[in-house]
Amino acid sequence: MKLHTKSDFTALMHRFLDPLLPLYSEGGARLHLGDTGVTYPGRTIEMEAFSRPLWALAPFWTGGGRADDFLCIYRKGLASGTDPESPEYWGDPNDYDQLFVEMAALACAILETPESVWEPLTDAEKADLAKWLDTINHHDLPGCNWLLFRVLVNLALDSVGMPCDMARAAADMAEVDKWYVADGWYSDGPADIKPQKDYYNPWAIQYYTVLYSVFAAKSDPARAALYRDRATKFGQQFARWFDENGAALPFGRSLTYRIGQSAFYSACIWAGLEPLPLPVMKGIIVRNLNWWLERPIFDRDGVLTIGYGYPQQYMAEQYNAPGSPYWGLKVFLLLALPDDHPFWTAEAAPLPVELTRAGVTGQPSADLLLQRLPDGQLNAYSPANYEKDDHGQFVEKYGKFVYNTRFGFSASRSYVQLEQAAPDSMLAFVIDGWTFVRRHSDRFVLMGDRLLSEWRPFPGIKVTTELVPTKWGHVRNHTVESTIACTAYDCGFAVPKFAAGFAAAANGTGAEAHNDICRCTVQGRGGEGFLVNAYPNTNLYDPNTVIPAVRYDVPVGTSVFTTTVESRHE
């Protein structure tokens, strides 16, 4: 899709939002998009779906856009949703309530365009909305990026002269500042809980602190300057998560937010920051959006689906409701830019040569080792140093040996069968029919050109894995100390098996699967070539895949297994 002018981006916003118009409730405060469940009740699910389009609509209205149909719905919905006497009342929030998450979009809408969403309300409606938002100051929140929702809400309340708690907001920001690591990276929570470093940097912590740097530029100039400096450093690092064709690294949780991957650069442009030249940032955004538009991410009615490269529930979080994917609309903050902003005439530029040159680059502040292959593939080697098993498929999202922008990764159906486990990019141990993989590492060392981790897939088995990048992939050196005789499968990437030109074979000590677009080869020093026919709908990119692997017999005692994994992609 052509994405160059403001009208191009506006048309894309309407492509995402117009299918929702007939689905809003009579009072405008709820939006029913589907019937799958999450950890919060139906009225919260429908409030979430109502709130998230504001991430695009508020900037659109700020930038002079007209969408009177949506404006009418949201003015009505903000009133009925916060009126305790209304049948569409969103409810009184409790501790750790999902409603606090959704308050962020409402707060930003008030901050960005009060003339659209605040000033038209009656005094009674303003009082109801402010009182409902203020509940965030009287409840506990998780110690993660959620604290910044309270900051945004208090900024919004303060901006319209309503009761707020800026002292509470300052305490929240002080807590978040403790999580800062270096190079622009934060951990998503205090260090003692081993929090992850993932997309909750660009589309959450960094995104919100950039917003703060603008909205609080006069009231808190020192912190605003600090946040802008950190965002600049982060923007130079984060660009390495994108490959030249627009794909972003599939890694971590909440990946159903899809187009939100490039939202950080929209925030930078909106805030007047240039961690990279403006044309380069535009190129990242345009290519990433078009990469998504080439995939079946909408249903037949044009509504976004839960999933990644196609509708898929296995990879979903327990908090991914039918309206959740619209969180990615943060990328449309660009629409707040004035019509004469240079962004609208700048040509989308490619990534700088220094970011795409083949080779290995460490990102120690993110606990990753990044590798560019000669054909443009991006590999990210992960130490599996997170332990939040309360998030769905956490092992698959953080524990693979390597994540690749062209092959994606697989989320298991179950571990009762190797095919259902779909353990691509893992060393999978099969014991009594059950599959066991690296859940997290006991210890890891990130070196300049390799990654070492120690892990225990099962009581009585200890594995030390060394990952060494090569020109077209990497070598895995595993030292296995086992008190159990079992079988292990060292697996490569998942290859689409119903694509044109597909073929796969296991010969001797290796295996290969390829089609007209991609190829993955796995070769062991010893062992036996093997093909894993992964369960349908496990891979994030393609619903039907085969995983080439090497099968090793694991005796009692100490064994050393060496496997080379290489990949090609057009």
Predicted feature residues:
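Functional cleft and adjacent loop/helix regions within the main domain
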Residues: 4-16, 20, 48, 67, ...
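Amphipathic alpha-helical scaffolding segments
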Residues: 175, 349, 493-496
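Low-complexity, Ser/Thr/Pro/Gly-enriched N-terminal "stalk/linker" regions
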Residues: 1-48, 72-77
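Extended repeat-based interaction scaffolds and adjacent low-complexity, acidic/S/T/P-biased segments
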Residues: 414-570
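Carbohydrate-active enzyme catalytic cores, enriched for enzymes
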Residues: 85-90, 129, 244-250, 257-387
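Aromatic-lined, polymer-binding surfaces characteristic
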Residues: 43-49, 54-60, 67, 71-266
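Solvent-exposed loop and beta-edge segments used for protein-protein assembly and interaction
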Residues: 47, 100, 322, 363, ...
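Long, charge-rich C-terminal accessory regions
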Residues: 337-475, 484
